[in-house]
């Protein structure tokens, strides 16, 4: 992983147009793991090194959080490793699913978003754990790839999830309410004040702009998908009516003209707070209605954006505050894990809401003409906010790109900083680059709309290419002077056989674009080796050394990443090897890792991931081979083996003649004086 230093990306000139050198770029950012990204991600570069570095780092986060569940396919996780409140044994959480799907819609391998959506709408997922915008995100995926069957097949499940929220709907107010903790935002004004300022982790139920915006967006998505499927006029009418009713109630009841902001009203009624009263301050959550295009385009509502820019209100030196300094309990720390501060939303910067605000701002700048004409906020502000968000990804103490849970708004330093916090996938970024800064605005119609949102005095050039859209491959380029790419202005390329569209200004352009069929997902083998958690009896791992379930589980849990920090360690670790020949002690010249499937299975190939880090003392083995347990109970090398050379911090491929066995073993020779970390031994 090569993400600690800004890199000068290389371009070549081809027929007058700049083409990014994918091999060089991916090698620089991902090292030996570059093949995973090669045919999957759009390429991007810009004159701002932080934006470029963060873009590729965010794809490494995406890659790290694709957990293989075996027959269930892939899901996106929120934390790198297991946490107690995840849905077991899968390790799923639904609060950030919307972000995960929006990032995944730009991945050329559609399997990740499709497997994930299938799982999240299944009965094995905890679909009600947190408030969510899953249906809306699935629809937004359709706007990119145009695959009708991918969205219509989930229509029934979407309605089941939507209707389940009736228990949180107040018919007298026409609004949904939620406990802030279930809104994934503990310690808000409503929960702290409901406790009398004593706590705020639980309680504080409120009618919030967040959940009502999510339900508005989900209702619109269900109506759109039903219309797409056809023959469901009643469903279309029902959900459009629900969306419209929510829209009006949010605007009528949650807009506070004094604060010029959408804010909570209390659902809870106790000695500290009163039912239906407004909370006593602005929160960043009040900008979420624009994330989902809920507000009407009125000058009155547009004034809310002024508070996002005000340094004494929601704009902190290092990022957007979740609450304002004027609040009595702003940044008061209530909750700890030992001596470490825990998660709170009473002022800290959260990438979660940063993403929502920037998504909403892109919507506002793109199609709210009355609001934008006020000049209350501009593309220059979008650029500044996006750049500040990008900088948040790099820890100022270590200089390493490592996104964590929340940050101090004055310093940009992580607040929580627990082991679970590193490389946290609880937000989006690359969707903001592609649909915001670069400006590809996905549509259900057969058009390509490009409306870049950036400050030309700050961003002098950028290029994004290999972007999937409606079955086409799109490239979008800006060069203020023409000195970087050899072509001045905005350039749009569609596939390889279409003329280039160009214009001198970075302004909105709409191009008719008949859609092609969406590409099929990559054909992916089903892994048979995945142990979903340590309590699942089979498959299970054993090893010649460090042989405990807690150790071996990490090498067969379906997770692959190569972050070079000890806090992000992943896999089974063997101690330092010496030159003796014993195979059952710490001094093994040859070591092994075994998988017991619990029954006879057919195995014929493997993907093997070894970690290497000079600073941590890990090296990939010098050689390896695969063995299976024969019917007589003895181990033997597989027949017809084709072993690729060992790849450190990447995937080593192995194939052999398919064979039935209950157990398979990876035997390897470590480097003398070095430790070995087996990140994953995935068997097919």
Stretch-by-stretch model annotation:
Residues 21, 28-32, 36, 42-46, ...:
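Catalytic cores of carbohydrate-active enzymes
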Residues 230-268, 303-471, 528:
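Non-catalytic carbohydrate-binding regions of carbohydrate-active enzymes
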Residues 16-88, 150, 161-164, 226-228, ...:
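Acidic/polar, glycine-enriched structural segments that form the non-catalytic walls/loops
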Residues 53-91, 106-123, 170-207, 251-349, ...:
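Extended glycan-interaction surfaces of carbohydrate-active proteins
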Residues 1-18:
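Fungal secretory targeting signals
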Residues 359, 616-684:
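Trp- and acidic/polar-enriched beta-sheet ligand-binding modules for extracellular glycan
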Residues 30, 90-196, 208-216, 279, ...:
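Aromatic-rich carbohydrate-recognition surfaces in CAZymes
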Residues 514-600, 609-620, 648, 680-682:
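Disordered, acidic Ser/Thr/Pro-rich linker "stalks" and the adjacent N-terminal cap
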